[in-house]
């Protein structure tokens, strides 16, 4: 916890960071173990996990877009009201919006890249499928941790 104190991170950000980090570690460990324990070749792993990863990134895109829309609505409603809100309120919303926008952008780009028919290409060396599986697994684990952090920040 000394690390967080030296970086001037408040409790709000610390809890979200720890929750996101735990989600990233758990999902990446699970995908790493699945890659080693299953006994499948990398191309088969990609083929079997691709529909689920597409669904995951599609869901994250929809969820993060909804959160951004609701945050925008919230700021418009609060700025139009006669009550005055604290500056920290708007700073918290801005932090959430920045992280959520990053999650949205990474998810959209990854979702589009995953829909390229690389699996059906015969000229690709088999060792690249292993790299591709671990890259997609790493990106999905990081996005999972980031969306968990956004949800914790909303709480």
Regions found by a protein language model. Give the residues of each.
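Alpha-helical transmembrane segments and their helix-start/interface "positive-inside/aromatic belt" motifs
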Residues: 2-24, 90-100
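N-terminal intrinsically disordered, cationic/polar leader segments
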Residues: 3-17, 30-54, 62, 155
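Hydrophobic core of alpha-helical transmembrane segments in multi-pass integral membrane proteins
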Residues: 18-33, 105-109, 143-148
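Membrane-helix interface motif
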Residues: 30-44, 100, 110-122
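Membrane-interface interhelical loops and short amphipathic "cap" helices
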Residues: 40-56, 85, 118-131
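Transmembrane alpha-helix detector for multi-pass membrane proteins
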Residues: 50-116
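Membrane-interface helix-loop-helix modules in multi-pass inner-membrane proteins
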Residues: 103-139
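Alpha-helical membrane-embedded segments
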Residues: 133-155
